[in-house]
Amino acid sequence: MPVDRIEIELADARSPDLINLVTALDNFLNKVCGVERNHGSPIDRLAHDDTQMFIARIAGQAVGCAGLQVFADGTGEVKRMYVVTEVRTTGIGSRLLTCVVEAALAAKLSVLRLETTEFLPDAQRLYRAKGFVPCPAYGPYVSNPINLYFERWLTK
């Protein structure tokens, strides 16, 4: 699939394309790291006003997604970051994460956090390249800190 015309757009969390991508992400995570480590938000949770979802498309085909959930304390979390296998390593993940960071900056958030797993070293490299550093478990993950957590401070 040629990747010269990548488009990223805001998406309705209940759109069929986003549902398909999130389903593919869940299937991938369950296979790679097990159901017990997949803390992904369900579609209904992503459809709230505090969450923006982005879809990456190539020639109209949905090939990736990522979201930003904004919390009342002025922090945010990267949600449901995924790129289909066939177009990984093409920069789509980087572009999606840039969109999420830009949305967090526009919302004047102080810090942006995310959860990942040791089973996704490529994702970890991307997060580090975008200025994220390891941090302790936070929010809903404190009681079950079995994955890896990263943050990027957006204000000084």
Where are these regions (language model features)?
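Active-site acidic-Proline motif in GNAT/NAT acetyltransferases
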Residues: 84-86, 90, 118
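Acetyl-CoA-dependent GNAT
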Residues: 2-79, 84-86, 97-99, 103, ...
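Short coil/turn segments at alpha/beta junctions that flank glycine-rich nucleotide-binding fingerprints
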Residues: 74, 90, 106-110
